[in-house]
Amino acid sequence: MPTEEHNEEVPETGELLTTGDMARLSESTLRTVRFYQEEGLIEAVARADGGHRHFHPRELRKLELALHLREAGLSIANIKQLFGL
């Protein structure tokens, strides 16, 4: 479950986050991060050797918002509408 404040530092704008970073910082799971990416709610900006996804830090904010909205009872379809997708 995401919290309002992170206990860990988020990388600066130029630094990319791994799927593991996204899961840890949003207090979710790797599976959750992959699910939200597959649904189009967050977008990986690159894939490293070995297929590892990398995300811009702004995608962390989108993930956290989506998690809060799901917790509030909104469907994925409703969240997509709110995100303009």
Please identify what each model-predicted range represents.
Residues 1-25, 39, 43-49, 57-85:
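Arg/Lys-rich, alpha-helical DNA-contact motif
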Residues 29-32:
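Short coil turns linking two alpha-helices in DNA-binding domains
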